[in-house]
């Protein structure tokens, strides 16, 4: 059987070692004779899973002790509402950086709760799509916080620069790039991320929030989205997505066993360099993102003749390269190469691309 490499943007590929262990433990976890999906979230066995998961995540990201780690429901879209309702307080505005599709989605949700100051940072660099450097972001004085998305999965645009905005509260949607590289958590007030790209299966959402920002929620905020309530209840205010939590915990251990975030950053750069080189080195393919803002996680590309898109997708699936269809908003192709994607998968893709170009160019 041809080895399958899954380039889906999310739910995305999980480490093979994690899946195999989950398969082995599925019906008899920890010698209990039952699945981890079937035990109480308040049992001592699952509480150990929860505690180890949090500690491993803290170790990986070097999360300071004055930050709470929350394991939540709802995905990033729930956080689009939770962030303003938890952080606005008595203020009526917040700075929202518009750098792409998902940043704009957060803005649309925020408009229900405040008057966002929208700062469009998209620009053209050598006729390619790019992002203005942070020093050019025109932040307002009265904003409750600054919100941005460091990696746009659809646009294939990344903001690698870390924020340095003095005492402003910075909120970042790290859904598609968390754990892919080292970051300084202390520069942020809130970091949130849906799990289904670089953490684990869909259904779990991580929130990392500085403790001094707790307890400021608006009265109308549903309790299940209140960071203070979730922190006070150790993310167990209601039954959490236990299986997704368990699998994510195994991914954290896998990351630590494979060298942590420094090693992931190195591997991800190597994979991205290989794929972008294959695109740039062949006139048959094109990526229109400026070099400084190219995503290491999500690589969109266009074929010279869009009439060949369907053939490319059919032949790629036959070659064991799945989920390469670009998002409906931009079309073309997209290869998502998160932590779990091995270098061998990217090599297989680039070899297929070269062969396809030879046959159809």
Curated annotation (Swiss-Prot):
InterPro entries reported for this sequence: Aminotrans_V_dom (IPR000192), Aminotrans_V_PyrdxlP_BS (IPR020578), Pser_aminoTfrase (IPR022278), PyrdxlP-dep_Trfase (IPR015424), PyrdxlP-dep_Trfase_major (IPR015421), PyrdxlP-dep_Trfase_small (IPR015422)
CDD domains: PSAT_like
Residues the record lists as binding L-glutamate: 42
Molecular functions per Gene Ontology: O-phospho-L-serine:2-oxoglutarate aminotransferase activity; pyridoxal phosphate binding
Residue ranges of the TM segments: none
Family the entry assigns: Belongs to the class-V pyridoxal-phosphate-dependent aminotransferase family. SerC subfamily.
Function summary: Catalyzes the reversible conversion of 3-phosphohydroxypyruvate to phosphoserine and of 3-hydroxy-2-oxo-4-phosphonooxybutanoate to phosphohydroxythreonine.
Protein name: Phosphoserine aminotransferase
Lineage of the organism: Bacteria, Pseudomonadati, Pseudomonadota, Gammaproteobacteria, Enterobacterales
């Amino acid at each position: 059987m041809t080895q399958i490499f899954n380039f889906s943007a999310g739910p995305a590929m999980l480490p093979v070692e994690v899946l195999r262990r989950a398969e082995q433990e599925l019906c008899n976890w920890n010698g209990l004779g039952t699945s981890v999906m079937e035990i109480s979230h308040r049992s001592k066995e699952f509480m150990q899973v929860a505690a180890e998961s949090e500690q491993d995540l803290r170790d990986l990201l070097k999360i300071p002790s004055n930050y709470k780690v929350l394991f939540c429901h709802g995905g990033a879209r729930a956080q689009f509402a939770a962030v303003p309702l938890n952080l606005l307080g008595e203020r009526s505005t917040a700075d929202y950086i518009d750098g792409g599709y998902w940043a704009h989605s957060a803005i649309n949700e925020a408009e229900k709760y405040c008057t966002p100051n929208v700062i469009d940072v998209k620009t053209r660099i050598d006729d390619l799509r790019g992002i203005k450097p942070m020093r050019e972001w025109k932040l307002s004085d009265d904003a409750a916080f600054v919100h941005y998305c460091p990696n746009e999965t659809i646009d294939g645009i990344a903001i690698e620069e870390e924020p340095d905005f003095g005492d402003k509260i910075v909120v970042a949607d790290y859904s598609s790039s968390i754990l892919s590289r080292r970051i300084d958590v202390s520069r942020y007030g809130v970091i949130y991320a849906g799990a289904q790209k670089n953490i684990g299966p869909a259904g779990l959402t991580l929130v990392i929030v500085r403790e001094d920002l707790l307890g400021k929620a608006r009265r109308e905020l549903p309790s299940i989205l209140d960071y203070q309530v979730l922190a006070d209840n150790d993310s167990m205010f209601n039954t959490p997505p236990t299986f997704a939590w368990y699998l994510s915990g195994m991914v954290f251990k896998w990351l630590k066993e494979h060298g942590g975030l420094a090693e992931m950053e190195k591997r991800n750069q190597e994979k991205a360099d290989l794929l972008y080189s294959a695109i740039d080195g062949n006139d048959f393919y094109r990526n229109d993102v400026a070099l400084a803002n190219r995503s290491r996680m999500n690589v969109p590309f266009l074929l010279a003749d869009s009439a060949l898109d369907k053939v490319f997708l059919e032949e790629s699936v036959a070659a064991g390269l799945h989920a390469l269809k670009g998002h409906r908003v931009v079309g073309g192709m997209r290869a998502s190469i998160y932590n779990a994607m091995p270098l061998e998968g990217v090599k297989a893709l680039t070899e297929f691309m070269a062969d396809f170009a030879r046959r159809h160019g």
